[in-house]
């Protein structure tokens, strides 16, 4: 129930509704799972179309009322493809490459709230056009240690990327969420019972943002974690 129910905008073309309708989402998806190159390559994925009707949102528009209210603001569509890949080449024993990606094309197709706060053709909030990650792990045998255990060493570089996106569908609330690229590196050794690893996440200390939100006249930003260097040790008490 909206507290400022019945409040009109300046020309009377819009009145804050007493309640909002349930938004509806229809999702159509075609997926696949494949194994190629004599089981060296696995590629799974899906293509999808999402039809959103009566998208709910919370609006703060001082030209109408100095209170937040909810409304069915727009209809929208999302077309996308996502997938994950694992490649373990026989010609390079010990190497495994993993990756995943997401491609989105989102759009406001019809504006339902005649206040000018939502614009047809804009993308949806927090819907980056492309996101992806890639990780390569190489393992090799290490000579037995003083306890007579056979050890396995590994090195694992990785990269994560996200393009920029909008923080809201409302014009006066929205801001651009900064995209980012992060590189990581890990080096370690393991046996049947224990493992140890040193790692560096966001190796080059790149900037970026996970989210933005507007509240109390301020943009509140959640940044990506800065460069983090650490060590992990695990033991299996079996």
Where are these regions (language model features)?
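Flexible, solvent-exposed coil segments and beta strand-coil junctions
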Residues: 1-13, 23-26, 57-67, 108-117, ...
């Amino acid at each position: 129930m909206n507290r400022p129910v019945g409040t009109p905008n300046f020309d009377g073309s819009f009145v804050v509704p007493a309640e909002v309708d349930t938004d509806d989402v229809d999702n159509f998806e075609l997926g696949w799972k494949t194994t190629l190159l004599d089981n060296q390559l696995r590629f799974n994925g899906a293509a999808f179309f999402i039809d959103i009707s009566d998208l709910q949102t919370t609006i703060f528009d001082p030209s109408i009322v100095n209170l937040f209210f909810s409304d069915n603001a727009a209809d929208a569509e999302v077309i996308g493809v996502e997938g994950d890949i694992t490649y373990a080449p026989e010609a390079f024993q010990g190497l495994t490459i993993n990756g995943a990606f997401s491609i989105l094309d989102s759009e406001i197709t019809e504006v339902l709230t005649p206040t000018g706060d939502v614009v047809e053709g804009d993308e949806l909030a927090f819907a980056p056009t492309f996101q992806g990650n890639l990780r390569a792990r190489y393992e090799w045998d290490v000579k037995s240690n003083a306890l007579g255990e056979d050890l396995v060493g590994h090195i694992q570089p990785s990269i994560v990327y996200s393009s920029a996106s909008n923080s809201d569908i409302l014009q006066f609330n929205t801001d651009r969420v900064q995209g980012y690229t992060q590189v990581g590196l890990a080096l370690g050794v393991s046996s049947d019972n224990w493992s140890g690893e040193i790692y560096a996440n966001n190796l080059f200390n790149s900037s970026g943002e996970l989210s933005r939100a507007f509240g109390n006249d301020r943009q509140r930003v959640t940044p990506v974690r800065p460069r983090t260097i650490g060590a992990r040790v695990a033991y299996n008490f079996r």
